[in-house]
Amino acid sequence: MERNIKEEGKFRYVEIGEGTPIIILHGLMGGLSNFDGVSDYFPKKGYKVVLPELPIYTLNILKTNIKAFAKFVHDFVKHKKYEKIILLGNSLGGHIALYYTKMHPESVEALIITGSSGLYESAMGDSYPRRGDYEFIKKKAEDVFYDPAVATKEIVDDVFTTVNDRIKLI
């Protein structure tokens, strides 16, 4: 689903609904579109869903770490003047959410993590993603979800583009 991305200073984000903010942090190869179901569901239940675009590929390589990403989230929360948030993080976003919550527990009403780094995960097996092999990436993307149909062509294309972009290589 296409969303209107707001830009305010260094922040790019999608914001849907009114109420207690649920800030959703995407993973390393994730994007805002990964959360279409969540962003459609929770505003109807009285929540504001906020999906900031993390600066994963735009930060200086020496500042590309969990602590810097958590600071970015903290700056975003202050920018939006949120007092209490629900924080939901997936994969790398889960790791960032854990660190943020440790550093700023007073502002986190609830924490939800899925597939957070640091937890056992075997989606890529014991190998690295193979560049240029679309079918390999498609299969691995399908393995991430309980229902492989969730790994739409758009999601697979996004992961394939990221894996094959040497500038985004971390």
Where does each model-flagged region fall?
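Active-site loop/oxyanion-hole signature of alpha/beta-hydrolase fold enzymes
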Residues: S39, K44, V50-L88
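Structural signature of beta-strand start/N-cap positions in the alpha/beta core
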Residues: P21, K48, E83-I86, S107-A110
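Conserved HGGG/HGGXW glycine-rich cap/lid loop of the alpha/beta-hydrolase fold
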Residues: R12-L59
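Flexible "cap/lid" loop of the alpha/beta hydrolase fold
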Residues: L98-M103, V108-K139
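Short, hydrophobic alpha-helix immediately C-terminal to the catalytic nucleophile
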Residues: D36, H74, L98-K102
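Gly/Ala-rich beta-loop-alpha elbow adjacent to hydrolase catalytic centers
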Residues: G89, G93, A97
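N-terminal cap/lid segment of alpha/beta-hydrolase-fold proteins
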Residues: M1-K10
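Conserved alpha/beta-hydrolase catalytic His-Asp/Glu region
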Residues: R131-I170
